[in-house]
């Protein structure tokens, strides 16, 4: 599209001055930003349009000036300087001067180093011959000088027993040298001559050893490799000797518990410590196959523990089952909706009557007199035979009523087949169908046990007495099977425990 300058060139018109209003294009006015913040597009705009006038009180959109990260905090406090200051550790004896960074102002070199207080040393009193004899520290294999050497190493290395055992270089010849140190100082010239003679003798011995055969060399090497009596000390020997000396000193607090002495009465279990180390060595010397076998045994033991707890629970349930009273009647008839409805109706009837129901078929004490049924002749023409007949009929009726009103015994009821029921279920049913049944797994075992005895799975003649006996036999069989299962579990566990005990 042609501009105004192009049109003026075509028409040969002069150009406008720069201050002319026609050349000045109007500036676009900036629209005010919406109150809600940035204008939303797409799905957000549609969602806000659905809201209508219910605009949120707080803007959901993010302003452009907000950032995802927190602003840098404006600390108003002044920065604390760090000074490179020399210092001297009072725990050192060589007077070495080091430097370190210290927060704060300048520190003088005379200030105490804060970590020097942590340099604590263990000190023990010097043993003399009187102390050694008074405390009764003389034991076979230990001397006074060797005990002093041990206490010196303990105080120097702060009871770090691996370091003490590594630095232990005591030899039996040192006792003689320490005991005769004073005499050697007086007779210095003689000792020097003797030492020179010893050196010459040792050189001759070395030359002789070099000329020996290989077999003699091996023997000599073995002898040299064997440590002397003083160097054959183990860590347990050193610990035992140290704690015996300390416990003997602690029995005299007036002399050996001054400041600077750390005396503690400790009884060192030497045998237990040796066994513990041997056990750890055996653990570390295990092969991967042995480790896998131990893990498998641990899993088996955990399974046995779980099975033992489960068996205890089952045993408690079985004991409850054995101690529980046996039900006299079956509840199978009340397991259907029809039976429950019938039970509720009977209970409602009993509550309405307000008295106990009488047994069906029973006759009250006031039995009807059958004598009234016999017609009495009022005629005067009755003969004597008719009168006798009426008397006999009356006697028979009274005897029948007395027999009916009489309460029969259990034997008589069983003989005559008389039974009493609180409520008879409606409809016709087979008595054998009312026999209680168990779970399928238990029922099959009960049937198999009955067949072994020679009893069929269902009674052939299901009378009331036979059905009751059959139910009692089934219940006894179920209890017997549960006890047998529990006994088998106990036997297997006893067998496993005996096997584990034999392995140990």
From Swiss-Prot:
Q: Locations of Basic and acidic residues compositional bias?
A: 1-11, 184-226, 372-391
Which family is this sequence assigned to? Belongs to the SWC4 family.
Q: Name one Pfam family in it.
A: SANT_DAMP1_like
Location within or outside the cell: Nucleus
Task: State the protein's purpose.
Answer: Component of the SWR1 complex which mediates the ATP-dependent exchange of histone H2A for the H2A variant HZT1 leading to transcriptional regulation of selected genes by chromatin remodeling. Component of the NuA4 histone acetyltransferase complex which is involved in transcriptional activation of selected genes principally by acetylation of nucleosomal histone H4 and H2A. The NuA4 complex is also involved in DNA repair.
Q: Which UniProt keywords apply?
A: Activator, Chromatin regulator, DNA damage, DNA repair, Nucleus, Transcription, Transcription regulation
Where is it found, in Gene Ontology cellular component terms?
Answer: NuA4 histone acetyltransferase complex; Swr1 complex
Natural source organism:
Yarrowia lipolytica (strain CLIB 122 / E 150)
The entry describes its oligomerization and partners as:
Component of the SWR1 chromatin-remodeling complex and of the NuA4 histone acetyltransferase complex.
Main localization of the protein described in the UniProt heading: nucleus
For the biological process aspect of GO, one term held by this record is: DNA repair
Name the chain's protein: SWR1-complex protein 4
């Amino acid at each position: 599209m042609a501009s105004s300058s192009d049109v003026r060139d075509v028409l040969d018109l002069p150009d406008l001055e720069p201050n002319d209003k026609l050349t000045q294009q109007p500036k676009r006015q900036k629209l005010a930003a919406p109150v809600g913040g940035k204008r939303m597009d797409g799905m957000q705009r549609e969602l806000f349009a659905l809201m209508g006038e219910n605009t949120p009180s707080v803007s959901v959109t993010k302003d452009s000036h907000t950032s995802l990260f927190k602003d840098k905090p404006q600390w108003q406090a002044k920065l604390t300087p760090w000074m490179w200051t020399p210092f001297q550790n009072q725990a050192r004896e060589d007077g070495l001067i080091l430097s370190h960074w210290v927060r704060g102002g300048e520190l003088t070199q005379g200030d105490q180093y804060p970590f020097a207080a942590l340099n604590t040393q263990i000190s023990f009193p010097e043993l003399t011959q009187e102390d050694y004899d008074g405390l009764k520290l003389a034991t076979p294999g230990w001397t006074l000088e060797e005990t002093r050497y041990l206490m010196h190493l303990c105080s120097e290395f702060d009871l770090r027993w691996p370091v003490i055992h590594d630095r232990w270089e005591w030899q039996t010849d040192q006792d003689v040298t320490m005991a005769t140190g004073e005499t050697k100082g007086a007779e210095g010239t003689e000792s020097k001559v003797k030492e020179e003679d010893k050196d010459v003798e040792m050189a001759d011995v070395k030359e002789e050893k070099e000329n020996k055969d290989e077999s003699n060399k091996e023997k000599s090497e073995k002898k040299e490799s064997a440590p002397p009596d003083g160097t054959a000390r183990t860590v347990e020997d050193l610990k035992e000797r140290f704690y015996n000396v300390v416990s003997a000193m602690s029995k005299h607090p007036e002399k050996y518990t001054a400041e600077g002495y750390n005396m503690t009465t400790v009884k060192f279990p030497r045998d237990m410590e040796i066994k513990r180390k041997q056990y750890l060595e055996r653990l570390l010397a295990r092969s991967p196959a042995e480790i896998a076998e131990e893990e498998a045994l641990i899993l088996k033991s955990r399974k046995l523990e779980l099975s033992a707890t489960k068996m205890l629970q089952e045993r408690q349930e079985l004991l409850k089952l054995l101690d529980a009273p046996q039900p006299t009647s079956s509840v199978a008839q009340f397991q259907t909706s029809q039976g429950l409805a019938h039970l509720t109706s009977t209970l409602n009837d009993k509550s309405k009557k307000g008295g106990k129901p009488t047994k069906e078929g029973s006759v009250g004490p006031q039995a009807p007199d059958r004598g009234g049924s016999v017609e009495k002749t009022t005629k005067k023409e009755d003969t004597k035979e008719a009168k006798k007949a009426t008397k006999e009929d009356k006697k028979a009726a009274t005897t029948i009523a007395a027999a009916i009103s009489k309460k029969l015994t259990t034997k008589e009821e069983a003989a005559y087949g008389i039974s009493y029921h609180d409520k008879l279920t409606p409809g016709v049913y087979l008595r054998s169908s009312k026999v209680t049944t168990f779970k399928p797994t238990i029922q099959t075992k009960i049937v198999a046990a009955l067949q072994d005895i020679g009893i069929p799975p269902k009674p052939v003649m299901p009378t009331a007495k036979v059905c009751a006996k059959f139910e009692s036999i089934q219940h006894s069989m179920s209890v017997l099977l549960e006890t047998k299962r529990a006994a088998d579990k106990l036997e297997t566990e006893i067998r496993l425990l005996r096997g584990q005990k034999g392995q140990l």
